[in-house]
Amino acid sequence: MRSPLLFSLLLVSVSFACKCAQRPAKEVFCSADWVSRARISQSITVQISDGFDGTQFGVEHVEIFRSPNNETFLPDIVHTASHSAACGLSLDVGEEYLLSGSMVNETLHVNSCGQIRPEGLAKEVTGIVIEWSNIPKDFPEEMKKFECPSKDE
């Protein structure tokens, strides 16, 4: 009796999991409002709305590769969903990552489908968001040369 119920629950949870299409790094970069090398300083669970939690990360933007209106400053708080099934990111305090996302009302947001995955990563590098130490050495310079169409087009 428990096996069919457990199987049904697993099937439902898998069907509601976050699914992302793989896209080239430049396409993800150009579709993002902001991209930075970010060091995580804090992680706090916050209530977004009735019954829904989110995670708020304190970040230090070590290097900014893309920002709205080419600003040299980005807010030091980044928001994401608390669960991977809702496309949320899990980030470790003290680690540095290549992060990219959207900016809505001066608030930074990230999700698993909007992360840049450089071509040529070592096979053992897995995961949705890439730790900075695993980014190919030439990729930061490559990002600086990306030419993106205007967001208005």
State each model region's role.
Residues 2-153:
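Transition segments tied to proteolytic processing and entry into folded domains
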